[in-house]
Regions:
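Active-site neighborhoods and metal-handling regions in enzymes and metal-associated proteins
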Residues: 1-262
């Protein structure tokens, strides 16, 4: 299932340009949709209500529901992970409450290519200070990882940068769920862990597209898949988990974030 990335070394310039054009357009749709989702969410809404809105918006904006294309179909258009749920949260009928932590992870399919992005927010206006700090540190770790991206950089450079920020912030580092390449498939080579050693791992090439997605927790990093949904990943100690993500293009002299909003 892990396909090689399309890059300048292995593909024609036309093929690389086609990929970049499609992923820029799809990424912009995704970024704008997640921006609007952040404004849409409020206490009292259920996961299934939010999921229905997201599904409608994906279609309205001209993209495809990526999770409908999985071999083992996910029960929703977006992953919604509340409180102790870390990632892959299946939408439920439980209403969100003031102060809940909720992570949203969304893949889109557009013009033959996938893009992927995630963010974590606190519902309403009441924020637990420790949870608020976790969100800030985790997002900072993502941007520190992104700053390492350029031709010739190693995957280990990214993981090392992410890990250092998370550990300095006294957060648990999730190691069994990681970032990945993306393009014609949702998950492609290379794997992009949130830990690593500088100078180790796959060496990035101009035209590569990867997802950098730190995951952290306030407690110990052990986690499990909830048997009720067979999808939702929860923290074993019941602590709060956090997740953020962007799709990144390796450019000739650095990087471009494809999933930013306007």
């Amino acid at each position: 299932m892990a396909n090689k990335l399309i890059n300048i070394e292995t593909s024609s310039r036309a093929e690389v340009d086609q990929k970049i054009t499609a992923m820029r357009a799809g990424g912009k749709i995704l970024g704008n949709l997640l921006r609007d989702l952040r404004e849409y969410v409020e206490p009292g809404m259920t996961g299934k209500q939010i999921d229905a809105w997201v599904r409608k918006e994906i279609v309205k904006r001209g993209a495809g529901v990526a999770y409908d294309m999985l071999e083992e179909e996910f029960p929703g258009a977006i992953c919604i992970s509340v409180n102790d749920a870390l990632v892959h949260g299946a939408p439920t009928d439980e209403p969100l409450e003031e102060g809940d932590k909720v992570s949203f992870d969304l893949d889109l399919y557009y013009d033959g290519y996938f893009t992927d992005s995630a963010f974590t927010m606190i519902v309403g206006t009441k924020a637990n200070p420790a949870v608020k700090k976790m969100l800030q540190v985790t997002e900072s770790s993502m941007w520190e990882g992104i700053e390492q991206v350029k031709p010739g950089a190693h995957i280990g450079d990214i993981g090392h940068a992410v890990e250092q920020v998370l550990r300095k912030g006294h957060l648990g580092v999730i190691e069994n769920y990681i970032g990945h390449g993306i393009g014609k498939s949702m998950h492609e080579h290379p794997e992009v862990p949130n830990y690593g050693k500088k100078g180790h791992g796959y060496k990035l090439v101009e035209g590569d597209t990867i997802c950098i997605e730190p995951m952290s927790c306030l407690g110990k990093p052990a986690n499990f898949v909830d048997k009720d949904s067979n999808w939702t990943v929860r923290m074993k100690d019941g602590s709060i988990g956090c997740h953020c993500e962007h799709t990144i293009l390796v450019t000739h002299d650095g990087y471009e974030v494809l999933t930013l909003a306007d």
